[in-house]
Amino acid sequence: MKPVYRCRVCSAYTEEPVHCGRPAEPLMTGEQRLRLSKLMTTLLRHLPHEAGLRLDPQGWVGIDELVRGIRERWRNRHLYQWVTRDHVIAVALLDPKGRFQLDLARGRIRAAYGHTVRVELGYRPLSMDELPDKLYHGTVAENLASILSEGLKPMRRLMVHMTTDYSSAVETGRRHGPNVVVLVIDPRCLAKHGIPVYRASDTIYLAPSVPPNCITGKIARNPQSARKTYLHA
């Protein structure tokens, strides 16, 4: 990830070393940013108790409480003594996938999606007019038979995750193995089946499940090249 700077003029967090015409103040290296982002994701989605955090029913926790938990309670806290409120806010604001939501007026933060701990995010179901034309979900060929038979299920998460960004779906699939398959999903089909679709960030959408007949296409990725192979739906 890119390093993060703070503008000496407007105080904005930025990935650019020059902002408002002046050299910006270094805040985090790219390595520090990546490590902190992964830790924040782990604590806010899956393991808040391991840093002594108590999420509210909607998944929010105080920013200062998160910083204290990381520095005082997390098992590898000796690696994170540099973390301050500014670092947490900067990671959240600059996250390229919108993984975090900030409520600075109340001094709190939460994960926008991806939870395995039970939370009620309170997102509004999208209307037909608000739905994108198609969504993608990354998986691997080994999972295709069960998916095409039973559909997509949340598994350990609370919701099925889909994206409007094809490359992000490929990246997700690669986490599960080399034989990546990107599923094409019709969100209007979900709505017609009474399955709500929620928007969690600019590119991430959620649904409780995806039945097989709402999967309209499959795109296989050759692990040795960038070539796409369109499979029969």
Curated annotation (Swiss-Prot):
Pfam families: PTS_2-RNA. The keyword Ribosomal protein does not apply. The keyword NAD applies. InterPro entries: Ptrans_KptA/Tpt1, RNA_2'-PTrans_C, RNA_2'-PTrans_KptA, RNA_2'-PTrans_N. Keywords: NAD, Transferase. GO terms for biological process: tRNA splicing, via endonucleolytic cleavage and ligation. This is Probable RNA 2'-phosphotransferase. The gene is kptA.
